[in-house]
Swiss-Prot record:
Chain ranges of the Toprim domain: 10-93
Chain sites annotated for binding Mg(2+) 2: 62, 64
Chief location bin: cytoplasm
Keyword Metal-binding: yes
Catalyzed reactions: Endonucleolytic cleavage of RNA, removing 21 and 42 nucleotides, respectively, from the 5'- and 3'-termini of a 5S-rRNA precursor
Gene symbol of the encoding locus: rnmV1
UniProt organism field: Ligilactobacillus salivarius (strain CECT 5713)
Protein name, entry field: Ribonuclease M5 1
Cofactor binding summary note: Binds two Mg(2+) per subunit.
Family, similarity comment: Belongs to the ribonuclease M5 family.
Length: 191
């Protein structure tokens, strides 16, 4: 695929490192900003805020603890950024190593960027904690597995029960979207 055929991304994509940048640029035509790890400096946060104001920002970090830490730091400093998520499967290395955007295929990256979520920091929850409990997402023998599969289906990343509630609220996932996802997940169990 040549440069002219690649999907163009207006926003700046925030990634963790230079290998992530290389992989992103294999998949799409986009500018990136590298955090260089989870110890994000105030200067980097200021840059992200400036870029958010001028072009918009997409946070695209690894689906691991450090990636989630970076995502949280950026979200708190610059509310309203967009988010792209890879599944752990899509970010897994072909050999030994840790999960990372740098291991994702160009197709997986494009798919993640096609399903962005924009934060609604002050949004009212559309789904209650009770709804999540009734759906078996916060307790029970399959809760963890259901959350993992829900995160993959909705492309919002893996969460624990508490994080799931916050993420569904933050991204304003509707009850209908949750219902559709759960039907899909539970139908998978029948195969």
């Amino acid at each position: 695929m040549n440069e002219n055929d690649k999907m163009k991304i207006k926003e700046v994509i925030v990634v963790e490192g230079k290998d992530d940048t290389k992989r992103i640029q294999m998949a799409v035509n986009a500018d990136t900003l590298e955090t260089r790890g989870s110890a994000i400096s105030d200067e980097t946060l200021d840059q992200i805020e400036d870029l958010y104001d001028k072009r918009g920002v997409i946070v695209f970090t690894d689906p691991d603890f450090s990636g989630e830490k970076i995502r949280k730091i950026i979200t708190e400093a610059v509310p309203g950024v967009k988010h792209a998520f890879l599944t752990k499967h899509d970010a897994a290395p072909s050999h030994k190593g840790s999960l990372g955007v740098e291991h994702a295929s160009p197709e997986a990256i494009r798919e993640a960027l096609a399903h962005l979520y924009t934060e609604v920091p002050d949004g009212e929850p559309l789904i209650s904690r009770e709804d999540l409990a009734v759906a078996g997402l916060t307790s029970g023998p399959q809760a963890k597995e259901y959350r993992r599969r829900l995160g993959e289906y909705l492309r919002i990343g893996y969460t624990n029960g508490k994080q799931l509630y916050k993420r569904l609220k933050l991204f304003q996932i509707t009850p209908d979207e949750l219902k559709k996802a759960l039907e899909y997940i539970k139908n998978e169990d029948n195969y």
